[in-house]
Amino acid sequence: DNAKAVLTYCFFIILSGSVANLLLDVDKFMLNFYINIDNIAFYSVAIFIATVIAVPSRAMHQITYPITAKLMSENKHDELNELYKKSSITLQVIGGLILVGILVNINELYSVLPEGYSEGIAVVFLIGISKYFDLVLGNNNSIIFNSKYYRAVLFLGLFLVFLTVSLNMIFIPLYGLNGAAIATLISITLYSLSKLLFVVLKMELFPFTKNTIVA
């Protein structure tokens, strides 16, 4: 029974990771059908710049994942809730500083790139906002992955893929590169809200405090 449970868990985690990787390329794949292929390079560079905002969360998750697992196995709800809040406010501050740093220096950054790449400036802003919103949720993923509701991540991820593809079909023909970024912003925001509500309603954990507004 234990072996079956472990294999089932690994299966869902691997599938969830595959969905996440798919999302990294779905925009660029769909742009091929609507705009000049040369412009996709502008989008790729903009995505790369905006993704820098998510770097702190990767380091944070490496630290909080085992701590989260330990607290959940010991049913220490209050300590887990405190960790959730601390991870949220920490990533909010660090991610916010990185986002502001990128946006303040975006024109200088694009001045060293070949002409035409500046078309991706709005993409950097839109994707940056979506990454930042995801950061503010702290160790949300760690909590869901270590709970009995870990299957929910896969289903939410599939919902995100469907939503992203649908929104891309609407916004890319209207706004080109910016349309793909708008679709991603809406999709990630709704996905993040879904995870937030899931953790709040199912596990009674909440990442925000009065310091969230101050920060």
Model-derived features with residue positions:
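Helix-loop junctions and terminal segments of transmembrane helices
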Residues: 46, 50-88, 141-146
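Interfacial segments at transmembrane-helix termini and the short loops linking adjacent helices
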Residues: 37, 102-132, 138, 178
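C-terminal transmembrane helix end/exit motif
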Residues: 1, 139-143, 185-215
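Interhelical loop/hinge segments that connect adjacent transmembrane helices in multipass membrane
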Residues: 1-24, 63, 67-82, 202-214
